[in-house]
Amino acid sequence: MQMHQHNDQPETESMIEKAHLKKRYILASDFDQTLSFNDSGYVLADLLGISEAEFERKATGMAKLNLVQQGGELAYLLLHDPEFHSKVRPEHLREAGKRVRLKPNIDALYRFLSEEVEDYHFDFYVISAGPVEVIRSALEGIIPADHIYGTEFEYNSRGEIERILQVTAGYGKVAVVDQLLEKLKIGPDRIVYVGDGSSDIHVMLHINRRDGFTIAVSENKYLAPIAKRSVISDSALAILIPILEEVVGWEPRLIRELFESKGLLIQQWDKVQTDMLTIVPVSTPVEERSVVAVEE
C-alpha cells in the first residue's frame, strides 16, 4: 500500500495519474456534526452575541414554517433576520469556522482515501448547507477549498449579505452530487455519502436509488433507516470502517491491521442493530367478554 512517485513529478500530478489506474469513487460528506462536534450556526450566533436559546428559537421557527429546505434555516436567517443580517460579515463567517470543534483524524481520513487503499481512489468532497466561508475556514489545510461546497452569498460594498447565490440544502445537495458525477465522469454507483441529519435525506435517497452507498453517523430516526450503514464514533476515521467493508470488501481483520500499521488501535467495535419502538396503551381497551355456558 506504499505510494511511489518520480522525483521530477509533482505530488498532485502523481495522485491524479494513479487515480486513473484505480477504481475511482467519490466520498461526499456533510459537515456539521458529521466532521464536527457542534453546529456551526450555534458557533456563529455566539460570535455575534446572540444567545443559543434565541438562535434555536429562530431556527426552529423557520423549520416549522417549511419556508426553506431542511438545513437552509441559517442561510435564510443571515439574509432576512434583522439581528443576524445587521451583524454578520464575511470575516465573522471565517472566524466562526476557526472556532468549530472538528472531529479528530479528518486529515488522516483524507489521506487514507486518497492514497492508502490499494486499487481504490476516493475523491473527498464536503457538501454542507452551512456558509461556505465557515466550512472552508474550519477545514483549511485539511481539505482543498475547491472540494468544499456550501451555501454561497453575494455581498455589497459594506460587506453585508445582499442575496443568496446557492443553497446546498435538501435538493441542493442532490444537484451538487450530480454535478460532481458529471465533472469527474464517474458512475452513480461509485459515490459514497456520509451525513447525520434530516437535511441529508433527499441526497441519500437519490444515491441509494442509483446503487450508491450511504452512511449515517447519527441515530436520527428519519435518516438511520435510509442509510445502508450507520457508524457512531468521535473519530472521523470511523467512516472508513463501512467503506472498507462494504465497498472495498475487506474483512475486519484486514481493517484492524491497516489501522495498526498506522499506529492506531480500534479499541471498541460493537456491531449492533437498533430497533426503534414506541409502545403505548391502546386507545380503547378491549372489553372483557364473559363466556356463558348454556345447558340443554
Region annotations inferred by a language model:
Residues Q2-E152, S157, S230, D234:
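Alpha-helical substrate-recognition element adjacent to the catalytic core
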Residues G97-E296:
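C-terminal cap/substrate-recognition subdomain and adjoining C-terminal extension
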